[in-house]
Structures are given as C-alpha cells and as structure tokens.
Amino acid sequence: MSGQALAQLEGVREDAGGFDLLAPDGTQYRVDVTDGVFDPHNPLLAGYVAGRRVVAFVGPTVDRIYGDRLRAYLDARLEPGSWSVHTIDSGERNKTLASVERVCAIAKASGLDRHGVMLAVGGGIVADIVGFAASMYARGIRYIKVNTTLVGQVDVGVGVKTGVNALNTKNMFGAYHPAHASLNDPALLATLPAREIRCGLAEIVKMAVILDAGLFEALEEHPDAFLRSSDGALETYVVRTSMRLMMEELCPNLREHDLARLVDFGHTFSPVIETAGGHRLEHGEAVAVDMALSAHLARLLGLADAESCRRVVTLLRRIGLPVFDPATCTPELMTQALHASWQRRGRELHLVVPTGIGKATFVERLEDVPAEVLRAALDALAREGRTS
C-alpha cells in the first residue's frame, strides 16, 4: 500500500466489535469489545493465539474468580500442552523489575520461544508487568491483554506503554510495546469492588474534563455509573466513549515524541502523591486529587472560571473519590512534584489544566505556578477535603 493510501487510513476507526488504530509511524493494533470472552464458543481470543505456545499470567484475585473459566477456555480451544496459566503477585508494590524477571523466568521454563505469546489477564498492573516482560523477552515477543478492570479497559488497555516502578519513581523503567490485541468484556466489571470502579471512573472523568462535555454531563447525572442496577446502556456509552477519546488522543503521538499531552491531566502531582504516600492511595485516587488540585490552579491562574472548577471537584466527590490527601498534599511535596514533572518532560512543565468542561490547556513554565498560588490551591482543597 502506498504511503498516501496509508495516510488516508491513519487514525482510529470504531465498529460494533471495537476499535482499530493506525498511527502515523505505522503502528497498528486492535482493541476488541466482546461478550463472553471466556465462553468456549467465543473464537476471539483463540483466533489471536492459534498455532502458538501461550503462557498466561493472572493475579491472585482474577485467578480465584476467573481462573477456572480461563483454563477451561484454553483447554477447549487450544492444542493440549500448548498453554499454561501462572499466578503472579499484583498490586502497586509488586510492579517491579523483580516481577518482570519472574515472568520471563516462567516463560523460559515453559518453553516459550520467539513465536510464542504472553497473555496478561487482569488489571493495569498485571498488563504493565507482562507487557514490559514481553517487550524484552527474546528481544520482544507478542502479547495479548484481557482487561478485567475499568482502569484496564479505558486506560491501560487502549495504549502502548508498559512499565514498572523503580528508584522511588513511578514507571521509571518501561517500553512502548503495543499489545497484539486488547480484549474487553463488559461483564468482567461486574465482580469489581466499588473502590476499583471509582478508580476507573477517575480516568474517565479525566477524558471528559479535557475533551468531552457530554460525557462529563452524563457522569454528573449518574455518578453511580457501574455501581447501580441498570440495563448497561449508559455504562456502554461511557466505556466506549472513553476508549475512543483516549485512542484518538494517543494516535498521533503514540510514542510521546511530543511531551505535551492532554491525557496527562491528573498525572503531574499524582506520581508523588502515590509514591510519597507509600501507595496508600490507589492510582485512580491519586489522579483524582491531582485533577482537583489542577482545577483549582486553573481557577487561581485565571484560566478557568470558578463554576468549572466547582463542577470538576464536585463530580469527583460525588463519585466517592478523594480530592485531598493531608499526608502528601503539602507545598513541599507538590513543589517537588512540579519539578519532577518539569524534568521528566524535557524541562518543560506541560501542566494540563481545564479551561472549562471539555477543554484544557497547558501551563508550560515552572515560574507560571507561583508558590503562593500553589499554596492557595492546596488550602482550598484542604477545606473541601474536610467537608467530604
């Protein structure tokens, strides 16, 4: 196909079964939405791994809930002796190089060659660990994700980044390694605890604030989405809209050649909130605090009106997410977070702040966030946090 023809196909295309992405650099991958992913009559997963050795990895909770169904599916659809399932520790504290090495050791002991497939079944942490292992094993092999959490389906499951924490820094080591396929079954979300759902909703709020006022308004009307009895129509709209928005935003800049990214809303202060807090807050909870702080900064810097700021913070609170963490939301630590982001982003701040609902901009320089403004934003959040 000619370069001109490829250029015409670039972008994200949605169909009834999911999304296809073709990036300007030629990277392409599929994100599927399917019912009954572990039903032996569903050929989707088997079709992606046919004729290859498969080494699957699951966390303990996923193994307890879905392990039997996963094994029954692989047993029914794949050749005997061509697959194995292994449990690995999940949780942010296990997102380490040691976990990646363990995955690679299991793969080697299982006879996985360069034509084999690593299968990650779980949330974002399992996907990050297994994806990073796949990027290095035999200089890079195919891997597939079955995303079982809301964060996994709307965030980790639609991008190409993998990584682990190291040197007291979140995602210090990692690789851009697109999954061969990313499979999402809405029914898998039904077994999630409320806290996991809320963390996923934080990432959805992120996309709504920066890109889609309609999605934001839907969440304002139903902050209990995924936690209520319903026919699932709203939840389908929310998940698919979030997936599409994220993929469309990632596509032109898949490997982050441009470090100014709107999807980094909520991800400037949150790495320090997570790390300094000993991962007491989940990732989505730290992102929520970051978004609330960024909304107040936008208000104080004259980039957003008070009503937009109020709506962002109020929605987060109505969902049940924190908007302030006394142990980490100190001027000292949040200044440290700004400097760390400035350094990580090529000595440009690229702080994403809302300018309204469904739109955002960047604060580019450290000096554009004066110490007194940061302190005032934290004071405002502290007052709101006390009334939660």
UniProtKB/Swiss-Prot annotation:
Assigned EC number: 4.2.3.152
UniProt xrefs under PANTHER family: 2-EPI-5-EPI-VALIOLONE SYNTHASE (PTHR43622:SF3), 3-DEHYDROQUINATE SYNTHASE (PTHR43622)
Family that this chain belongs to: Belongs to the sugar phosphate cyclases superfamily. EEVS-like family.
Entry keyword Nucleotide-binding: yes
Organism lineage string: Bacteria, Bacillati, Actinomycetota, Actinomycetes, Kitasatosporales
Function of the molecule: Catalyzes the cyclization of D-sedoheptulose 7-phosphate to 2-epi-5-epi-valiolone. Probably involved in acarbose biosynthesis.
SUPFAM superfamilies hit by this protein: Dehydroquinate synthase-like
InterPro entries documented for this protein: Dehydroquinate_synthase, DHQS/DOIS_N, DHQS_C, EEVS-like
Gene Ontology MF, one: metal ion binding
Cofactor(s) this protein requires: NAD(+); Co(2+); Zn(2+)
NAD among keywords: yes
Catalytic activity: D-sedoheptulose 7-phosphate = 2-epi-5-epi-valiolone + phosphate
Ligand binding (NAD(+)): 92-95, 124-128, 148-149, 161, 170, 188-191
Annotated Zn(2+) binding sites: E203, H267, H283
GO terms, biological process: antibiotic biosynthetic process
Protein name as catalogued: 2-epi-5-epi-valiolone synthase
Keywords: Cobalt, Lyase, Metal-binding, NAD, Nucleotide-binding, Zinc
